[in-house]
């Protein structure tokens, strides 16, 4: 399919990365290639490592960026950054970008099952080679497990009712499509709650997607690994789309900026030194204009840290 993809906070992210024409940069979430293209435009002798776990994204972006010869495409998870760079004989890089969550091209590809607005098989896998999909979560998890996932990853106040309704419904037969699930959620969420706020299925779909793709698992460790492979003055820029991700990024940056574990009123004896300086004291948010032209950007937050 043709991937139309509007990169979120594009101008701001590129500015914060402080791109050097001869530098080595990593786009850990290639997606539709929007951020990668802007990085490549600014490189002369430099190089871009473009990573995505979704092979379709790699293929589409390779085509989009075919005029640039200084890009290396890697079909892998950005969490394996150390192994990826080692395999390329690269020791340090000058900047890293992550644009977390599901991308617009994945939402647009109906059969992937990411969207609650289009009927599709229960899938939601970012890596199509993974044997584990949304179908397994919805049809095989116990009521308690479903409630935990929906509450924890969707921050859904009706998690208990939704889990109960899913289990009750699947007694009649398998839940195979997204619209089947949407209907169950609508029945579970009281009418008064459905009348206001976002689509009633939004949080549950987010929760199942995070569970299927293990999006939050090891994110803090991945950020630490990325900071480790940054050169001094190199920057890491991370765009998040919900509070769970943002909290992990914020807290990991804070820990790296102030790793001291000594009691606050005592002189430091632990020997742990700051590793980064946080560049964005508050997250950078999209402009009103960007939200109007790209609704996906509404919940985006950008945080940036610089290696000391």
Curated annotation (Swiss-Prot):
GO annotation terms (biological process): rRNA base methylation
InterPro entries noted in UniProt: RsmH, SAM-dep_MeTrfase_MraW_recog, SAM-dependent_MTases_sf
This protein's UniProt keywords: Cytoplasm, Methyltransferase, rRNA processing, S-adenosyl-L-methionine, Transferase
Highest taxon of the lineage: Bacteria
Enzyme Commission number: 2.1.1.199
One CC-aspect GO term: cytoplasm
Presence of the UniProt keyword Cytoplasm in the record: yes
Main localization category: cytoplasm
Top EC group: transferase
Substrates-to-products reaction catalysed: cytidine(1402) in 16S rRNA + S-adenosyl-L-methionine = N(4)-methylcytidine(1402) in 16S rRNA + S-adenosyl-L-homocysteine + H(+)
One Pfam family matching this protein: Methyltransf_5
Region ranges (Disordered): 289-308
Subcellular localization(s) per the UniProt record: Cytoplasm
Binding site for S-adenosyl-L-methionine: 33-35, 52, 78, 99, 106
One Gene Ontology molecular-function label: rRNA (cytosine-N4-)-methyltransferase activity
Nucleotide-binding among keywords: no
Stated family: Belongs to the methyltransferase superfamily. RsmH family.
Main function: Specifically methylates the N4 position of cytidine in position 1402 (C1402) of 16S rRNA.
Protein name, per record: Ribosomal RNA small subunit methyltransferase H
Origin species: Thermoanaerobacter pseudethanolicus (strain ATCC 33223 / 39E) (Clostridium thermohydrosulfuricum)
């Amino acid at each position: 399919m043709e991937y139309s993809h509007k990169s979120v906070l594009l101008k701001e992210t590129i500015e914060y990365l402080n791109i050097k024409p001869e530098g080595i940069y990593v786009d850990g979430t290639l997606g539709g290639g929007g951020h990668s293209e802007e990085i490549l435009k600014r490189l002369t002798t430099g190089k871009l490592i473009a990573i995505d776990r979704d092979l379709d994204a790699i293929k589409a972006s390779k085509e989009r960026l075919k005029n640039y010869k200084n890009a290396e495409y890697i079909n892998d998870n950005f969490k394996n950054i150390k192994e990826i760079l080692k395999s390329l004989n690269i020791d340090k890089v000058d900047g890293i970008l992550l644009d977390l969550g599901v991308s617009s091209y994945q939402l647009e590809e109906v059969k992937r099952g990411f969207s609650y607005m289009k009927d599709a098989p229960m899938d939601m896998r970012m890596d199509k080679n993974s044997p584990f999909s949304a179908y397994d979560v919805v049809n095989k998890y116990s009521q308690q497990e479903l409630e935990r996932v929906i509450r924890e990853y969707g921050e859904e106040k009706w998690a208990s009712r939704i889990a109960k309704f899913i289990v009750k419904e699947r007694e009649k037969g398998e839940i195979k499509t997204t619209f089947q699930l949407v209907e169950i959620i609508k029945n579970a969420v009281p009418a008064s709650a459905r009348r206001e706020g976002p689509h009633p299925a939004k949080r549950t779909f987010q929760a199942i997607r995070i569970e299927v793709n293990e999006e939050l698992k090891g994110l803090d460790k991945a950020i630490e690994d990325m900071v480790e492979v940054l050169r001094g003055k190199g920057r890491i820029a991370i765009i998040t789309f919900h509070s769970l991700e943002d909290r992990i990024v914020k807290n990991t940056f804070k820990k790296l900026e102030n790793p001291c574990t000594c009691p606050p009123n005592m002189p430091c004896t632990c020997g742990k030194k700051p590793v980064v300086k946080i560049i964005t004291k508050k997250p950078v948010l999209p402009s009103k204009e960007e939200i109007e032209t790209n609704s996906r950007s509404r919940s985006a937050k950008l945080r940036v840290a610089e290696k000391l």
